[in-house]
Swiss-Prot record:
Entry protein name: Glycine-rich RNA-binding protein 2
Chain segments carrying region Disordered: 148-168
RRM domain span: 8-86
Function: Possibly has a role in RNA transcription or processing during stress.
PROSITE patterns: RRM (PS50102)
Keyword ATP-binding annotated: no
């Protein structure tokens, strides 16, 4: 990856439903110039999926944000802040939005490849970084499959015993 392509991006998990792009940016602006902040929403309902990304202009800003914000409270919820995976190639069966999966994809894939992933909706086995945020199939936000954040069907998932299922 060329130096110009380097992104200093944080994954932010455990967001309150009320947190939006602006409040996310404001919470992280103290650590340096925020290039982008994005709360990921469900395409069908428009509701927050409980996680997002913040991109900084420098590596030091990103590292400071991770160190100082991980485990802290934002809008009444304790958040998780980690360095985000690279977007990868964006094509084929994985990658960010590529092929049969990708970020928010429906058929495996996942953020940065693997099976399942962030927003993967079917037959997910991977998730964030390949092993699932919390392990198992489905990953963070997965709808079909076990594991994921909260176990069962993922954070707010439709199947399994998620513990974080806001649909009741």
């Amino acid at each position: 990856m060329a130096a110009a392509d380097v992104e200093y991006r944080c994954f932010v998990g455990g967001l309150a439903w009320a947190t939006n792009n602006e409040t996310l940016e404001q919470a992280f602006a103290n650590f340096g110039q925020v290039i982008d902040s994005k709360v990921i929403t469900d395409r069908e309902t428009g509701r927050s999926r409980g996680f997002g990304f913040v991109t900084f202009s420098s590596e030091q800003s990103m590292l400071d944000a991770i160190e100082n914000m991980n485990g802290k409270e934002l809008d009444g919820r304790n958040i998780t802040v980690n360095q985000a995976q690279s977007r990868g190639g964006g094509g084929g069966g994985g990658g960010y939005g590529g092929g049969g999966g990708g970020y928010g994809g429906r058929e495996g894939g996942g953020y940065g490849g693997g099976g399942g992933g962030y927003g993967g909706r079917r037959e997910g086995g991977g998730g964030y970084g390949g092993g699932g945020y919390g392990g198992g199939g489905g990953g963070y936000g997965g709808r079909e499959g076990g594991g994921g954040y909260g176990g069962g069907g993922g954070y707010g998932g439709n199947r399994g015993d998620s513990g974080g299922n806001w649909r009741n």
